[in-house]
Amino acid sequence: MIKSQKEYLERIEYLNTLSHHYYNLDEPIVSDAVYDELYQELKAYEEENPNRIQANSPTQKVGATATNEFSKNPHLMRMWSLDDVFNQNELRAWLQRILKVYPNASFVCSPKLDGVSLNLLYQHGKLISATTRGNGLEGELVTNNAKHIANIPHSIAYNGEIEIRGEVIISKEDFDALNKERLNANEPLFANPRNAASGSLRQLDSNITKKRKLQFIPWGVGKHSLHFLRFKECLDFIVSLGFSAIQYLSLNKNHQEIEENYHTLIREREGFFALLDGMVIVVDELDIQKELGYTQKSPKFACAYKFPALEKHTKIVGVINQVGRSGAITPVALLEPVEIAGAMVNRATLHNYSEIEKKNIMLNDRVVVIRSGDVIPKIIKPLESYRDGSQQKIMRPKVCPICSHELLCEEIFTYCQNLNCPARLKESLIHFASKDALNIQGLGDKVIEQLFEEKLIFNALDLYALKLEDLMRLDKFKIKKAQNLLDAIQKSKNPPLWRLINALGIEHIGKGASKTLAKYGLNVLEKSEAEFLEMEGFGVEMAHSLVNFYASNQEFIRSLFELLNPKSSDTAEEKQKSSSVFSDKTIVLTGTLSKPRQEYAQMLENLGAKIASSVSAKTDFLIAGENAGSKLALAQKHGVSVLNEEELLKRLKELD
């Protein structure tokens, strides 16, 4: 239960960290069940405090942010995420909200496959593009890889423009075979089928994708000009075009029928060919769908009825510590092997040491293990009645298991702050070169991996010592490409200070905090915890993280600053901000605009604006698109300046 705005802001930061690891890094920190519980508490707080909702809340966003490996591609119609329901009471309440207004509504129910959502665009019967969900507005363009998925037709018998959406999955059988191959080749195993599907779909070499035996199961449409009256008719039409049909699809009229089909799926889940984590429920009548509409994040006419976790009893025989890409230390329990949902489980995440202490889990305990969402094995609780005196306390580590560096121990998480730790070096450098950091063109993760394999770099300083002959050793590098990368690396010198601070990847310090820190000059990282706490928007965790990071990497930071010679301010950017009518103004965007809201939000933030999600007396501008609704009325009530899209574009043009 969240009791204060401070706890609310901390929960947002924590959930966004979990989402980043799950969607963008394919490196889950907690199980789906834990995330769902934390998310629902956040949602409950926001429902009670609608005027305090923050724009960066996960309730206001969909899915992942596109990575730098593939080009971004917009969806013609937004890809929404689904609201979850977890029990009969929640389902009954969801149904009643619809049936109260539309008593004759019917519902299409189908298995919720746990894979990667993909949007296929067909024009004149030809497959034009395949794009991952991404943030719902745009995703990664993976067309070449999608064409290697056997059951995706390259052409269809329909000449209109249509977006066909579905889930890319790998069957349980093919997943097991893939991991056996990787084991024999001494390659790291995939944690679960979802990660395998995601990693396979996002391969830069499409021949690898072809070998992975991915499947595409359609579940809906985006933009189209079909004239059907019912959702099920759309699905039947898609199957008639040559796509695979959804198994166990049913049409239901009431709560009882939906519950019966839900429990049928639960009984069948273990023998189902792919992993399931629930049942999708969608209003069948398309006119009712249109009238119900959407929230900011999800459709009101559909939901996901989540499955309960599968559980078994086994024994903890050991504990190891893994170092994630952010430096987070995750304790992992080694278990006596136990079969859950057709998979042999011999490890389970303990999440963090705070969780271990809270649940009083000990070495040699018999424990309850679940596979939440049929994916991540997790220990729920110890069976204390089985204790026989052989149990031992699981101790929180003091040094990194990889580099032996002293760890930063926070209330919940434990981190390795050493930038030179091999377990986190690669990801640190990928972040260092990323768009919101030093923005080094051509230096993506595959290039960085090659540089590590060739032992050409060990930290960010080594990038600036690379020579042409070094890069010529890399795969697919010729003189022009190598020289372009060297030029891009040199061009990254003399960056604005905030970019270099952000590039360091300090825990809890993102782009916004980096810009605040940069206002205090080149020696800002040498400040004390008390001085950091005096800065606007800085809490104890942020201050503590900054002090510990600088203490752990003082020599490296000084060398990097000396080499790159950052500018204490980005003169051109600051000049533009200071002259901007939007500088230091609070702005809310609402209604339908010709561009994604987040694109306008980014433009305005670059001009010094603060973007909020709700209108109040403190709001300076409301940018109102079509169908602006209640926010427009509230803005007029408070005397807030209202700009339509045309007026906004005119003002932005005046600032160029």
From Swiss-Prot:
> Does Amino-acid biosynthesis show up as a keyword for this record?
no
Q: Which UniProt keywords apply?
A: DNA damage, DNA repair, DNA replication, Ligase, Magnesium, Manganese, Metal-binding, NAD, Zinc
State the InterPro entries in the record.
BRCT_dom, BRCT_dom_sf, DNA_ligase, DNA_ligase_AS, DNA_ligase_CS, DNAligase_adenylation, DNAligase_N, Hlx-hairpin-Hlx_DNA-bd_motif
Q: Which CDD domains match?
A: BRCT_DNA_ligase_like, LIGANc
Query: Alphabetically, which GO biological process terms does the record hold?
Result: DNA repair; DNA replication
Q: Where does NAD(+) bind?
A: 32-36, 81-82, 133, 167, 306
List, alphabetically, the SMART domains matched: BRCT (SM00292), HhH1 (SM00278), LIGANc (SM00532)
Name the Gene Ontology molecular function terms of this record. Answer: DNA binding; DNA ligase (NAD+) activity; metal ion binding
Question: Which reaction is the catalytic activity of this chain?
Answer: NAD(+) + (deoxyribonucleotide)n-3'-hydroxyl + 5'-phospho-(deoxyribonucleotide)m = (deoxyribonucleotide)n+m + AMP + beta-nicotinamide D-nucleotide
Q: Quote the cellular component terms of the Gene Ontology held in the record.
A: cytosol
The record places domain BRCT at 577-656
Q: Give the PROSITE patterns listed for this entry.
A: BRCT, DNA_LIGASE_N1, DNA_LIGASE_N2
The positions annotated for binding Zn(2+) are 400, 403, 416, 421
> So what EC number does this one have?
6.5.1.2
Pfam families named among the record's database cross-references: BRCT (PF00533), DNA_ligase_aden (PF01653), DNA_ligase_OB (PF03120)
Required cofactor(s): Mg(2+); Mn(2+)
| Catalytic-site annotation from UniProt | 112 (n6-amp-lysine intermediate)
- Function description: DNA ligase that catalyzes the formation of phosphodiester linkages between 5'-phosphoryl and 3'-hydroxyl groups in double-stranded DNA using NAD as a coenzyme and as the energy source for the reaction. It is essential for DNA replication and repair of damaged DNA.
**NCBIfam families, alphabetically?**
dnlj, PRK07956.1
Q: Which family does it belong to?
A: Belongs to the NAD-dependent DNA ligase family. LigA subfamily.
Q: What is this protein's record name?
A: DNA ligase
Source organism per UniProt = Helicobacter pylori (strain J99 / ATCC 700824)
Which classification does the entry list for the species?
A: Bacteria, Pseudomonadati, Campylobacterota, Epsilonproteobacteria, Campylobacterales
Identify the coding gene: ligA
